[in-house]
Amino acid sequence: EFVWQHIVSKSWQLLTAPKESDAHAGLQLLKLYHKACVPDMHEFLLIRMGGKACGDWTCSLMDVHAGRLEAQLDEAKESFAHASHKGIHGTVAALAYLAEAADTVPLQRMHDLIQRVWTLVSPYLCAAAPENAEAEEEDQVHESPVSQRILSFSWRAMKEVAALHEVCALSHMTEDTVQEASDLFLTWLLSIRHRGAFSMVYPR
């Protein structure tokens, strides 16, 4: 119960925080219990997170966090303004960490999630960015608090999605997967007009 209350539950809560520092703290707690939690507690913790054990601890955690991201994306599709009060970047970062640690990665599911995030945020990141406005346009450029929040949500999500995409590509390197990964990175680099997000998706 101590592990759940002070480590796992806290990580679960922080991973959806809108602030990058809070989500990062949640990720560090995930790394702690992923590596240090004794096997006898795995099933108990997975049930508390709404998941179930599927034999492998890392894959079970991936399944739980992938399900959570799917639910977050469903919510954002219904009302992006409401969903942007939290964040998905922490959940995506958790998936990238777990994918890197896993023996096998559910590539199709990860690819679908990456595409869903891109579909969600691309209208905001591909629009003309205020920081790129010409001097004479500055008076016409105004961002409401809601649009600022959505933009922040979007570029943070895109940063972590790029990292997840890279991990997935490296986990199963074939000529086709490398080409697909390159094509998607190129699409992002050619489409994104928001300076912060553009710098984040450039592959390492």
Residue ranges and their predicted role:
Residues 2-18, 47-77, 106-143, 176-193:
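Amphipathic alpha-helical segments within extended alpha-helical solenoids and repeat-rich scaffolds
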Residues 3, 22-25, 38:
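Long alpha-helical scaffold regions
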Residues 16, 81, 100, 170, ...:
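Alpha-solenoid HEAT/Armadillo repeat architecture
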Residues 22-30, 79-98, 113, 138-169, ...:
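Extended HEAT/HEAT-like alpha-solenoid repeat tracts in very large eukaryotic scaffold/adaptor proteins
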Residues 35-40, 101, 171:
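Alpha-solenoid helical repeat scaffolds
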Residues 37, 65-69, 73, 84, ...:
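Charged, low-complexity, helix-prone segments enriched in Lys/Glu/Asp/Gln
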Residues 42-46:
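Short, flexible/disordered intra-domain loops and linkers
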